[in-house]
Amino acid sequence: MREVISINVGQAGCQIGNACWELYSLEHGIKEDGHLEDGLSKPKGGEEGFSTFFHETGYGKFVPRAIYVDLEPNVIDEVRTGRFKELFHPEQLINGKEDAANNYARGHYTVGREIVDEVEERIRKMADQCDGLQGFLFTHSLGGGTGSGLGSLLLENLSYEYGKKSKLEFAVYPAPQLSTSVVEPYNTVLTTHTTLEHADCTFMVDNEAIYDICKRNLGISRPSFSNLNGLIAQVISSVTASLRFDGSLNVDLNEFQTNLVPYPRIHFPLVSYAPILSKKRATHESNSVSEITNACFEPGNQMVKCDPTKGKYMANCLLYRGDVVTRDVQRAVEQVKNKKTVQMVDWCPTGFKIGICYEPPSVIPSSELANVDRAVCMLSNTTAIADAWKRIDQKFDLMYAKRAFVHWYVGEGMEEGEFTEAREDLAALERDYIEVGADSYAEEF
């Protein structure tokens, strides 16, 4: 067995977690109360597959290997009373009494510290139920207080306690349209600095990019958080499908790092997904393998706003789902390689890693997304993602030059030096990306 424990931290993390588990349950044929759908003798995905994410109790019920943590009760109370209340064990849902007030320092140093022991104890219990735990999957936002502060504290502690286990993150990057607080740049820079050495691979999801996709591809004039989370869940499901169903690539978490991370700090792959279609448009589109493969290289299908044509690719994984044959994939990849827009770094072979999972993508009934026969999720490590760091660093600098809002952080026991230290670390990260994108032969002169 190769189990994965999902840890959802903060409001964004928990709400994305809800969307994911609703989709996972549907994909594996598990009902809202944790029992199998009628007519199934065991969950879809084969014994090895579903048990990475679900634990079977003695009563034939399937329980997600997941923990929800938030510093205030509202979001987790919604899980306790919502449609999936019987799916989760009450011990999996942990909340505090007062929130982090969008303050990294409250989540990391004061309020978060009070709850962290309880969370780790629950994680320990869950790890004991596993035969061969392979690692952790985090979902949290970088801009909120709990997601950034408590999220990074947990990652730090887990890396000491479970050093060899993989730690993958799905991190929500703040966006101007959906900004919930003015201090998001501070929280993002501080949490990235703290987690940089502890996370093995971080898939960033930029709210602005998702917002635009919902408007453009799905025709939603004013996308809500539940629309955004539904789309994010679809992407996370595609990334994890190879862990949950029989597939040939990325069958365990370590493989993500091996295939995508050339240097420990350069661990922020860009995620693209296609096709993203509304139910109205789906009947008019063919979605051949080459069409969806090409779509992954278009900025409109990326989960982070950046321009890959200005960057260079270091590694590429294409994860297909559904009705796909290898010959079509090879032909599609050849077409892509012949395009002048796709530039690889010169020190890395132009290899594309291909994974095919024959289980077609599912869509929850209330979703705006159309049901399709095949889909592809591309994970690419590209130097273009440094744009995202540049954007947030500039916003950080504007505020920090005036020391705006800093007293709220210092008041929670944080030292001001941590701001400059974190900012310097991110400046170094930007430089790292410039260096890996430089041609290797240029250094000889």
From Swiss-Prot:
GO biological process terms held by the UniProt record: homologous chromosome segregation; microtubule cytoskeleton organization; mitotic cell cycle; mitotic sister chromatid segregation; nuclear division; nuclear migration along microtubule; nuclear migration by microtubule mediated pushing forces
GO cellular component: cytoplasm; microtubule; nucleus; spindle; tubulin complex
EC number(s) per entry: 3.6.5.-
InterPro entries recorded: Alpha_tubulin, Tub_FtsZ_C, Tubulin, Tubulin/FtsZ-like_C, Tubulin/FtsZ_2-layer-sand-dom, Tubulin/FtsZ_GTPase_sf, Tubulin_C, Tubulin_CS
Enzyme class: hydrolase
Compartments reported by the entry: Cytoplasm, Cytoskeleton
SMART domains: Tubulin, Tubulin_C
Other observations noted: Present with 12300 molecules/cell in log phase SD medium.
Its biological purpose: Tubulin is the major constituent of microtubules, a cylinder consisting of laterally associated linear protofilaments composed of alpha- and beta-tubulin heterodimers. Microtubules grow by the addition of GTP-tubulin dimers to the microtubule end, where a stabilizing cap forms. Below the cap, tubulin dimers are in GDP-bound state, owing to GTPase activity of alpha-tubulin.
Name listed for the protein in its UniProt record: Tubulin alpha-3 chain
Organism of provenance: Saccharomyces cerevisiae (strain ATCC 204508 / S288c)
Gene that produces this protein: TUB3
